[in-house]
């Protein structure tokens, strides 16, 4: 019985590998996918009737927002979601993680990471080609007739909540809030969603489930995709404060430290150090400017975007070579100086952006900040975040902890 847990873990990892290999084998045979059908005759008949997806050979520009949790990625996602010619998807890789990685391993092992990244790259490649049927491999329970109510945060995508994908009662110009979308639109028809995707010139996807830009090299180098990466970073101290408030149970020991002034002996410091290590590795790659990232990579600090959202958004769109939509500018004006009471929801994007970027300084004790600074010293210097050398410096809003840096895109 002593080794029973090891046997369970090995069986789980073997199961993951088998699932992923099966999906890879299936999709390698054809770009035309009809997942989830066990009746051979029925599968052939439906495949003949369904739409055939071909890889995008045009020079459309597609976008990947590479971020980590609580770094401002939902805000950046909205800069693309509001564009009328962009098909935006919010965290589709959630489904890969939820399907392939056993909850009890938490996806921390190297084997888990390899499986997750391989499957993620395959799904991203398909989604950029508007092959939304491929997503069905990871939706549980499987969609019926390509319809489902299980797409993660479907309401965070404007296109998936408007005509022709959704036909809500009322005005055709009605813009649904996320909760209203799920309630009023009913099941998501992936065939209609794929059609809406193909009608637009660009696909933008946000993910917090790819650790480093190196993990995307195969996609960046694929000339059929013309993919550009926006890497969003934030002061790790701010990320820690935001996660502690949002994920109260997971970050309970950090909150206990804040409340008692004593560091718990069993504190999971990797909740902080993993962010810093991934940032450092990924940003180091980007700043070394390898040839495969030329014209493909832009580093954006959340703090710069929060302080001057319109200017930074214009820079982002200029890098991408996509005209800035007036709807995006209007959204920025309405959502970066908002009523603070509207931004209390943990996933809200309505807020005073400049104030939000600095709020962490009043939500962490100085001993926690000092610990974080010691653990993340390298990446803080790399990204231009200043050390707070005392409680007084930390709490004084007149003292900026963000250096003026000009992270120009690699063109």
Swiss-Prot record:
Pfam family, one: Sulfotransfer_1
Location of the motif Cell attachment site: 337-339
Source organism, top-level taxon: Eukaryota
SUPFAM superfamilies registered for this protein in UniProt: P-loop containing nucleoside triphosphate hydrolases
Catalytic activity: 3'-phosphoadenylyl sulfate + keratan = adenosine 3',5'-bisphosphate + keratan 6'-sulfate
Sequence ranges on the Lumenal membrane side: 24-411
Record's keyword annotation contains Acetylation: no
GO BP terms, alphabetized: galactose metabolic process; inflammatory response; keratan sulfate proteoglycan biosynthetic process; sulfur compound metabolic process
Membrane-related topology note: Single-pass type II membrane protein
Membrane-traversing stretches: 3-23
Pathways per UniProt: Glycan metabolism
Residues in compartment: Cytoplasmic: 1-2
Tissues in which the protein is found: Broadly expressed with highest levels in central nervous system. Expressed in cortex (at protein level). Expressed in high endothelial venules in peripheral lymph nodes, mesenteric lymph nodes and Peyer's patches.
Residues bearing attached sugar chains per UniProt: 56, 145, 189, 334
InterPro entries: Carbohydrate_sulfotransferase, Gal/GlcNAc/GalNAc_ST, P-loop_NTPase, Sulfotransferase_dom
Keyword terms of this UniProt record: Carbohydrate metabolism, Glycoprotein, Golgi apparatus, Inflammatory response, Membrane, Signal-anchor, Transferase, Transmembrane, Transmembrane helix
Annotated 3'-phosphoadenylyl sulfate binding sites: 69-75, 234-242
Disruption phenotype: Mutant mice are born at the expected Mendelian rate and have normal developmental and reproductive potential.
Keyword Metal-binding carried by entry: no
GO molecular function: keratan sulfotransferase activity
Family designation: Belongs to the sulfotransferase 1 family. Gal/GlcNAc/GalNAc subfamily.
Function of the protein: Sulfotransferase that utilizes 3'-phospho-5'-adenylyl sulfate (PAPS) as sulfonate donor to catalyze the transfer of sulfate to position 6 of internal galactose (Gal) residues of keratan. Cooperates with B4GALT4 and B3GNT7 glycosyltransferases and CHST6 sulfotransferase to construct and elongate disulfated disaccharide unit [->3(6-sulfoGalbeta)1->4(6-sulfoGlcNAcbeta)1->] within keratan sulfate polymer. Has a preference for sulfating keratan sulfate, but it also transfers sulfate to the unsulfated polymer.
Protein name (Swiss-Prot/TrEMBL): Carbohydrate sulfotransferase 1
Organism encoding this protein: Mus musculus
Taxonomic lineage: Eukaryota, Metazoa, Chordata, Craniata, Vertebrata
Gene: Chst1
């Amino acid at each position: 019985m002593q080794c029973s847990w090891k046997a369970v873990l090995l069986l789980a990892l073997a199961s993951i590998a088998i699932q992923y290999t099966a999906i890879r084998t299936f999709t390698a045979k054809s770009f035309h996918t009809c997942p989830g059908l066990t009746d051979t005759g029925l599968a052939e008949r439906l495949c003949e009737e369904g739409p055939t997806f071909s890889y995008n050979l045009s020079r459309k520009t597609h976008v990947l927002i590479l971020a980590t949790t609580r770094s401002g990625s939902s805000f950046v996602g909205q800069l693309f979601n509001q564009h009328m010619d962009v098909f935006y998807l919010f965290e589709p890789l959630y489904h890969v993680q939820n399907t392939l990685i056993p909850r009890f391993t938490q996806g921390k092992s190297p084997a888990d990471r390899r499986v997750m990244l391989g499957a993620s790259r395959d799904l991203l490649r398909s989604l950029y080609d508007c092959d939304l049927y491929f997503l069905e491999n990871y939706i549980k329970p499987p969609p019926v007739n390509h319809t489902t109510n299980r797409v993660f945060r479907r309401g965070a995508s404007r296109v998936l909540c408007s005509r022709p994908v959704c036909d809500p009662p009322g005005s055709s110009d009605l813009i649904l809030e996320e909760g209203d979308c799920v309630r009023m639109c009913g099941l998501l028809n992936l065939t209609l969603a794929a059609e809406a995707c193909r009608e637009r010139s660009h696909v933008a996807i946000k993910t917090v489930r790819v650790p480093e830009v190196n993990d995307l090299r195969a996609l960046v180098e694929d000339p059929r995709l013309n993919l550009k990466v926006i890497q969003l970073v934030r002061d790790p101290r701010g990320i820690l404060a935001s996660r502690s408030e949002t994920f109260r149970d997971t970050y309970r020991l950090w909150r206990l430290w804040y409340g008692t002034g004593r560091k718990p002996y069993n504190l999971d410091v990797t909740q902080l150090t993993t962010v810093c290590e991934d940032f450092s590795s990924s940003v180091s790659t980007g700043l070394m400017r390898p040839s495969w990232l030329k014209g493909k990579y832009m580093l954006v600090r959340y703090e710069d975007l929060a302080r001057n959202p319109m200017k930074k958004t214009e820079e982002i769109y200029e890098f991408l070579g996509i005209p800035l939509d007036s709807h995006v500018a209007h959204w920025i004006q309405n959502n970066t100086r908002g009523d603070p009471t509207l931004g209390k929801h943990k996933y809200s994007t309505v807020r005073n952006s400049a104030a939000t970027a600095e709020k962490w300084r009043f939500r962490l004790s100085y001993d926690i900040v000092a610990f974080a600074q010691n653990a993340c010293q390298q990446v803080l210097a790399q990204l231009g975040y200043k050390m707070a050398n005392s409680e007084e410096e930390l709490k004084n809003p007149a003292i900026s902890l963000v250096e003026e840096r000009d992270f120009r895109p690699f063109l």
